[in-house]
Amino acid sequence: MTQPTPKPPAVVLADDIPIAHTPPGGFGDTFPQPILTRCTEPLVAGAPDLRGMWRTVSATKAGVPVPSDQKIYRHVQRIEQCGNRLVVTAGGVIHDMRVDGTAEHGVHDVLESDYTTPINVVATYENGVHVLRPVGVPIEITRHLEGDKLIWKYVGDMQVTLQRVGGPNDPPPAT
């Protein structure tokens, strides 16, 4: 008797998973479930592998160390990637985007500061760096790896160094 040939696992593409958005008022203190868990599509060429749960270990503003009692030291972010899609979940927001250089497929969500102000952000990968450019605002937000650390350059000359504390499907650490 012949054994049935096992079926290869189904490929789940980034397109197969609905785009996520920040819930009204943000997600609060409890991280939502990961968005791209089921996705099996490989990362696009040129995408740095930023996947994981990340926690701040140091921060500077205009080159000056930020005091360790500041809120940024409690900052945790989850980065998920699949194909050309990237999702950052942190600070009460879910920024789900295609990293394809278009405003149409970039972030369409709200600011972390008030959870209501709409934003549209173009996302690209440039020389191993994830670059975000808000439409109509002359700034860049970047994330890149330096060894095993994630370097996040944010608005106002803020640079945050984060350490991976888990995978993208792991629960966030206690803060």
Residue ranges with predicted function:
Residues M1-R85, Q163-T175:
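Amphipathic/hydrophobic helical signal segments and adjacent flexible N-terminal regions
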Residues L50-P65, R98-V107, L111, I119-H130:
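Short, basic/low-complexity N-terminal boundary segments at the transition from targeting/disordered tails
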Residues P65-T116, V155:
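N-terminal glycine/threonine-rich, aromatic-flanked beta-hairpin/loop signature
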Residues H75-Q77, I94-D96, I119-V121, P138-T142, ...:
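A structural detector for short beta-strand units
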Residues I79-G83, V99, Y125, H144-E146, ...:
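Generic beta-strand structural signal
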Residues T89-G91, P134-G136, R143-L145, Y154, ...:
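Residue-level recognition of conserved beta-strand positions in structured domain cores
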Residues T117-I141, E146:
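Acidic, glycine-rich flexible loop segments
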Residues K149-D157:
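Short, exposed beta-strand-loop hairpins at the edges of beta-sheets
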